[in-house]
Amino acid sequence: MTHRRTKLFMMAAVVSYVMTSCGAVPINDLLDRASQRSDQLHSLSTTLSQELDSHFPPIGRVIMPRPSMCHTSALQTPNDKTQALQVSESELLSLARSLLQAWADPLSALSSSAFSLPHPAQSSIFNKVREMQEHSKNLGDGLDILSGKMGEAAQALSSLPFRGNDVGQDRISKLINFHFLLSCFRRDSHKIDSFLKVLRCRAANTQPEMC
């Protein structure tokens, strides 16, 4: 019993140290790290899309759902940098966190589907999806810390439920639905990256036209 209490005390001390250390990091540095991670995440999704394109059936481009069908499309977000610069810092962070959180289940669905995806680069695709999951989680943890420093508005989250766990049964359906889901993630990862870059720019007191 004494050993167990000692172990629990040590774990609590480690958690306390980590939280204190994170709390001591300036917002500018946290935004730099978050921006770097979001850039890596978007770059990875782009590379994965290109890899998937190498053996994507032509019919797939014709019947693939439109971007407006992405499960995150209901969230109203700035369409470009000019609009993003008009949104408050707290709201931008809230939007980035909402988008990222909305991809926890879809990324799991992509990971499960990639395990048996009918594609010559299946193994590479599977590994990249797992890597995206890891990057997404790490980024989410960082944004949670940031939101705690930026007030209640930054901590607000919009619910964007995902109901498409089954990507299909036949080869064509699997490839098309996988590609569609990945294209949605690539679009959203670009938004997240853009929002965080605007936040980083503002934190550095850079002139808006230079962001």
Swiss-Prot record:
Signal sequence, start to end: 1-24
Family: Belongs to the somatotropin/prolactin family.
GO BP terms in the entry: positive regulation of cell population proliferation; positive regulation of receptor signaling pathway via JAK-STAT; response to nutrient levels
Record-linked InterPro entries: 4_helix_cytokine-like_core, Somatotropin/Prolactin, Somatotropin_CS
Gene3D superfamilies the record matches: 1.20.1250.10
Protein name per Swiss-Prot or TrEMBL: Prolactin
Keyword Ligase: no
Keyword annotations: Disulfide bond, Hormone, Secreted, Signal
Cysteines engaged in disulfide bonds, as pairs: C70-C184, C201-C211
GO terms for cellular component: extracellular space
Domain of life assignment: Eukaryota
Entry keyword rRNA-binding: no
Protein's cellular compartments: Secreted
Organism, as annotated: Paralichthys olivaceus
An example Gene Ontology molecular-function term: hormone activity
